[in-house]
Amino acid sequence: MATTLPVQRHPRSLFPEFSELFAAFPSFAGLRPTFDTRLMRLEDEMKEGRYEVRAELPGVDPDKDVDIMVRDGQLTIKAERTEQKDFDGRSEFAYGSFVRTVSLPVGADEDDIKATYDKGILTVSVAVSEGKPTEKHIQIRSTN
């Protein structure tokens, strides 16, 4: 089966295990490192003529905490999470900002983008035209 998607759509983390490194160490007084190394987890696929990106964003309010933008063939999802957990007579805040950018496939229609949020999963759907990519041959001039 042939695909029209670019080979590499978005950069991968150089150190995907970095966040697991901190999880391996016990927390002192219930504290974790003050910086968040987690990435926004994404899945993408072509589905019925549309490019779909699904982002795992539990615990956010999509109306207030999520911003989706498109520019020059790049789709960017920004989210911010702030939550407070109470347990064993203590409370702990969990917060962080997340940003991911993916390149849209050839033929993506930046004017036909839809987004939904359900049970912690943000789905962004972009229409993609079925047209075949065109080739252009370049004439070479001799300078001799």
Curated annotation (Swiss-Prot):
Recount the PTM note.
Answer: Multiple forms of this protein exist in 2D-gels. The differences between them has not been examined.
- Stated name of the protein: Alpha-crystallin
Biotechnology note = In plasmid DNA-vaccinated mice, subsequent challenge with this protein induces positive levels of antigen-specific IFN-gamma and IL-2, indicating this might be a good vaccine candidate.
Where in the chain is the Isoglutamyl lysine isopeptide (Lys-Gln) (interchain with Q-Cter in protein Pup) cross-link?
Answer: 64, 85, 114, 132
Task: Tell me the classification of the organism that encodes this protein.
Answer: Bacteria, Bacillati, Actinomycetota, Actinomycetes, Mycobacteriales
Keyword presence, Ubl conjugation: yes
Q: Which UniProt keywords apply?
A: Cell wall, Chaperone, Cytoplasm, Isopeptide bond, Secreted, Ubl conjugation
The record's family statement is:
Belongs to the small heat shock protein (HSP20) family.
Outline the inducing conditions.
Answer: Induced by several reactive nitrogen intermediates including S-nitroso glutathione (at protein level). Induced in stationary phase (at protein level). A member of the dormancy regulon. Induced in response to reduced oxygen tension (hypoxia) (at protein level), low levels of nitric oxide (NO) and carbon monoxide (CO). It is hoped that this regulon will give insight into the latent, or dormant phase of infection. Induced in mouse lungs at the same time that adaptive host immunity induces bacterial growth arrest; induction is dependent on interferon gamma.
The cross-references to Pfam families, in alphabetical order and at most eight, read: HSP20
Query: Its GO biological process terms?
Result: cellular response to hypoxia; cellular response to starvation; negative regulation of growth; protein complex oligomerization; protein folding; response to heat; response to host; response to hydrogen peroxide
Q: Please list the residue ranges annotated as the sHSP domain.
A: 33-143
* Effect of disrupting the coding gene: Strains deleted for this gene show hypervirulence upon intravenous inoculation in BALB/c mice.
Main localization, broad class: cytoplasm
Q: Which gene encodes it?
A: hspX
Protein role: Acts as a chaperone, as it has a significant ability to suppress the thermal denaturation of alcohol dehydrogenase. Cells overexpressing this gene grow more slowly than wild-type cells, and are less susceptible to autolysis following saturation of the culture in vitro, suggesting this protein may slow down the growth rate of M.tuberculosis in culture and by extension during macrophage infection.
